[in-house]
Amino acid sequence: MVKKRQADSRDHDCSTDSGNEDLHHRKGLGSPGQSDGATPTTASCQHIKKAVDAARLRRLLKSTGLLYECSQCQKLGKTAGSAAGAGASEGAVGPGGNPVTFEFDNTLWLCLKCGSQLCGRARHKHALEHYQTPHSDSHALAMNTRSFDIWCYECDMKICSNLRKNLLECVELVKKLAQKPPTSTVTPSTPTISYIEEKLKAALEHLTPIVPMTGGSFDDSSSRGSLAAAGGGGGVGSSRNRQVAIPMPPPEPSSGLSTSDSLTSVPGMAKRIDQYSATTNGNTGNKRLLTLETPRIENERLPRVRGLTNLGNTCFFNAVMQCLAQTPFLLSVLKELSEPGEEFILPGGTFTIKDKGDIELPMIKGTLSSWGGLTAALANALEELQAGGSVFTPRKLFDRLCVKCPQFTGGDQHDAHELLRQLLESVRNEDLKRYQRVILQNLGYKDQDVNSVSEEMRQKCKIYGNQAGDRILRPEQVFRGFLVSTLTCQDCHNVSSRHEYFLDMSLPVAVEKPQPPQRRKPSPELSLTSSSSSVTPSTGQPTINTKFTDGSVNFTASSPSFFLHAHEAASLGPSKSQVKKEKERQRKAKRAAKKRQKSSLNLNGNDSGNGNELAESVDQDDASLASLGAGDGQANDGLEQTNGQTEDSTTSSVTTSEHSDADVEDNLVEDTAAPSTNNVPSSTASLTAPSKTYMDSNGNAQPPGEKRDDTPEHMDKDSLEEDENDSGIATSPAPTATNSSTSTSATGNNNSVAGSGLSGSSGALEDPLAPASLVTAGLSEKGASVIRQVSVGAEQGASNGTEDADGEAKAIEQPEKTPSQAQAMAQAQARTKRVRTQSYSDWSTTIAPRYQCEDGECSVQSCLNNFTAVELMTGQNKVGCDSCTQRINGSDPKAKSVNTNATKQLLVSSPPAVLILHLKRFQLGPRCIFRKLTRPVSYPNLLDIAAFCGSKVKNLPNIDRKQKKLLYALYGVVEHSGGMYGGHYTAYVKVRPKVAPGDKRWKFLPHGSKAELDQDDDQLKKLEELLAKEKAREQHLKVLDDSDDFSNSSSNSSTSDESQTPATPLEEQQTQQAQQPQQPQQLEEAANVRAPPGKWYYVSDSRVQEVSEDTALKAQAYLLFYERIY
């Protein structure tokens, strides 16, 4: 027997139609919208045998079919409009506390005995009255003609259709009839004159906000009053010859009342009077009233959201369709596929085929056919939803989707994100098949047998198919974006990038990015007993295992213990020698901490007098750092007792987290600071590197992984100091030429330090006054250059001379300069030495500063920040490095790939026109139990993703080169309420005006293929030159030969060891003239961007209610739909 799962008492928000019979007598067991998983059902019902007549039902339904309206309601003259008014007058309250004004669907209940189809309790309870009417037989069972639920009035419970065979036959019969269009029982009567007059009056009242009327009111009484006033009480003849008098405008509102108060009166008449007064009053009042009235009229012209019929637990489908119906560009793009005859070209090229060598594939030109069945059904459904009206039944689209994705059949609950992905992928595959037909026809594959095709032909088909798949197909233009994955090897520092497209981004719901498990660092008092102590069962005496888990310090050769922490009840105390050594270690740790703090504050290096003393102190500090970084405080003893280990305490015990200059675009190469820093050993840079926080300009403690200003983010911005010391993995990139020359120019007393810094990549050390060190201390590159100038002047003024590594004395010019003058000189020198280079590392920088997360923040921005953070790939996640493989194994093609530690980072390389964010709320918890994360995640109305986009995004044609923001506006939210095994999907959508054909937002749609992002450096340079020429032509400026970027060099910069091309003063002057008027204009344009106006609606299947924007921003979001507006 299979053990039944106990229903969760919290999971009640399942999806059924809004007209269910279980609205009555729920006895506290759930809400009216429960489904099979949570609605109380009975295992057996004794009324099934007497209350079901399948044969009679089949005969009746064959002639009448399923009805659309209740026959009793039609006889009594109760229409759907009166029902909706009655429902609204009952005082139902929806989200946000607003009264519910939704549309009732026409769900009917079919009596399984006589076949009558009547309305349920949600409307006029005719089905219940039919049961309560005395009959000679039982009429206790009724079936919902939309959701196919069966209800027993006698048991007051929901009945499972699988209990009896006759019940199952009835359900199958009704399901077949439900695919046909419903019929009406009563033919509409001939329209009367009064009915026509009421329709005309309603239409004219609806048009009054658009066309101001000058003939008075449509009310008969008001018309007669106007005639009497005009005729002075005259008779009929006078009323015929005289026109209707125009009513006097109302008095202007007092100064205490706002204009919005005067405009929010009775709909129709009040607006007509306001518009009339706007045309008769002064010019100032005209402009003000018309300006305020225009957006209100535009919003009122927007169609109301159309509800969707629940086809049986299809709330997941309905919620997604409501958001897709409000998606811009989608319907227009899909309609372009309806007409056949579109031409395309596949480039072909030279490719290597197995056992055939290199072959040349010709270019293919072809003509595409029209769209497929699923694409046509989707376009039809979207058009119906955008047109507005009553409840729409998307049966055709859902059936088409179920044919391609059978998992959605059966009426079970499914995931809304899964449905969205399957729907978009199915539409994409249909479009791709149009290309595949042309490819097969060109290769002569159409008339051949599949099994008889050669391997060469299969390879050709695959190559052409991949070229077609790399194209941005028509349905993907709306949602498709690109992510770039950048891998940096920690051994050879080789950087590689790979682009991959996405239709939506799945973000984990977490405050911080999950890091590898770290060992808890014990306090110094417990470090002596940090080895696991246990009591042997035989002797009862405690035994001590002094093997530590840091990987380098082994006190004894005993087996490693499972426990990493000491027991508090350890009875064995430390010896005197151990206490003495512990005190000595504490003193060394305090001295090292003081020296680190002192060296980080004294950036000008005035206290570096004697090289021998400094090297000695550095050795001691490194040893103390190693003792602290080992994790257990026992490093010194380990250094004395390790067998067969020789290590240099200066180089290999400490891993620096220096920042390289290779990951920026326009780097400032400063040569003036080098002479003044030669007498400062480069190993002192490691003292300032492992700081966990820094103080920004506002005095806030920030982690070193986040950016402070407009400078680009560094590759190792996570800076896992604890993991570095534990694993011995260096996170610093390879030293550049500047760092190497600084290390070799150190004094003779520190030759061993400089040599060790050059020998190993993990021990690469840099100058404390180098740009990366100053940036690590919390300064921007501009501020770092100013401090370098000031420190150089101060040091030179104190010593009156500095000796180079070669012993040459250099003359010193020491004019007094203010910080502003020093900054201006640094900028002038930077402009003359700016050079544009291209490298993979440009993808590791962002076009805007990194987002600063607050403590405990859980928002979409924090989720994106964690998604784009640098990951350390180590242990089981090591990455195969081609450079290391070639260096170690040579050019042997059969050599095994060498796996190394690496860092990985994901950034957006091409932003989509419509961004879909999926919050991963359903996760696998402890003990392999699925759970739902109900933690609130805040999301803004305007989202800026510039902090998560790579700097090469500026090369795209739909992004301005000086753009610092990429703004998206929210227009759709899919919310899930309930638990893991039972819930309900609803949607919040914003109805907005359609995008005009000439709107600039059309350029946000991508064109081309993925290969455009994977161009070689030469192709990229050519592309940049073309872009630079185009912009220079618009600005009437000359073209710079090196195709330099006109943006500020403090944002994204990079260094290069290649020859540098200095810019002429004339070019610099032209660049400044081009920058000055445009930079404020660009910022002002970004600040004035607003979300498109519109109305927010809450939609739950067929239930539609207008809500405020604040209500939509407080939902428990599962899917977020954003449209790009800037």
Curated annotation (Swiss-Prot):
Give the UniProt keywords, A-Z: Hydrolase, Metal-binding, Phosphoprotein, Protease, Zinc, Zinc-finger
Reported phenotype of the disruption mutant: RNAi-mediated knockdown in third instar larvae results in a significant reduction in survival in response to UV radiation.
The record lists Zn(2+) 1 as bound by C45, H47, C152, C155
Q: Which residues form the active site?
A: C315, H984
What top-level class of enzyme does the UniProt entry assign? hydrolase
User: What's an example GO BP annotation here?
Assistant: proteolysis
- CDD domains on file: Peptidase_C19K
Instruction: List the PROSITE patterns.
Output: USP_1, USP_2, USP_3, ZF_UBP
Q: Where is this region: Disordered?
A: 1-44, 215-264, 513-547, 570-762, 795-833, 1037-1089
Where Zn(2+) 2 binds, per the record, is at C70, C73, C119, H126
Query: Which Enzyme Commission number(s) are listed?
Result: 3.4.19.12
Name the Pfam families for this protein.
UCH (PF00443), zf-UBP (PF02148)
Q: Which reactions does this protein catalyse? A: Thiol-dependent hydrolysis of ester, thioester, amide, peptide and isopeptide bonds formed by the C-terminal Gly of ubiquitin (a 76-residue protein attached to proteins as an intracellular targeting signal)
Per its UniProt entry, which superkingdom is the organism in?
Eukaryota
Which Gene3D superfamilies does the entry link to? Cysteine proteinases, Zinc/RING finger domain, C3HC4 (zinc finger)
One of the record's GO cellular component terms: cytosol
UniProt feature, compositional bias: Polar residues: 32-44, 674-701
Entry similarity comment: Belongs to the peptidase C19 family.
What function does this protein fulfil?
Involved in the regulation of DNA damage repair.
State the protein's name. Ubiquitin carboxyl-terminal hydrolase 16/45
Taxonomic source organism: Drosophila melanogaster
